[in-house]
Amino acid sequence: MTSLHPAQHLTFSRRSAAALAAAVLFLAGCGEEAKTTAADAAAASKTTPAQQAPIPVGVVQLVEHEALDATVKGFIDELAARGFKDGENIRIDHQNAQGDQATLANIGTRFVSNKSQLIFASSTPAVQAMARATKTIPVVATAVTSFEAAKVVKSDAAPGGNVTGVSNLSPITAQLDLLVEIAALTPNTAKTKPIGVVFNPSEVNAQFQVDRFKAAAEKLGIEVLTASASSVNDVPQALNSLKGKICGFWFPTDNVIASAAATVAKVAAEAKLPVVASDSA
């Protein structure tokens, strides 16, 4: 497979569209009658269901929140724009794991049993589950910080295997500089105080970003205080445990934090603390 696409400056729906470049190539090769050329793929997209059965495509997201919803919508919309329409020449099976790892595993088994010819996975846990479920079905993923750190590819530069996609790694050093600058201008905060980080340590992508953020902060002589939140219910306590000790919050791309965005905003506003986050959900 081709190298992974670093799309940290794209919007989430654009990330899905970028990943589609690989997806269309896979779809063009699906089915006994399909060929690998762009012209043949376009012709195949115009065949009727009576001529060719719709190609089964699995779509899975870890949980429902704005960012992941946008990736799925962008992927499906771009497929349609390129002639691959659900219910016509493809059949999309969209599954939501509701944040449950066991459900993700079951979804992977479902896609394999249903002979999906392509799987689109949104989030790191989702692509990890799909990579465990199949070594042959092409898996295209987005909302993943590092495919290599997630251990679903040999390396981000040369994935190999059946998994590829789009990275959403944020410009961490620039985010740190921005937070320090804002904290220095914010009343009742002091840039000499530590920076607070709340994240789900069981999410590989979140831990990967936090490690990088800590390393960047250490170079500037800035302390980082962390608190873990394994579920949305843990977020308020984790946030409150850092209030009064920090000059501001930084958050990595993290599905738990994204799902609790309203809570994060409320607590930070009440504490009059600036926030810099990798996710806009």
Task: List each model region and its residues.
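Short hydrophobic alpha-helices and adjacent helix-cap/hinge residues
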Residues: 2-13, 18-21, 26-281
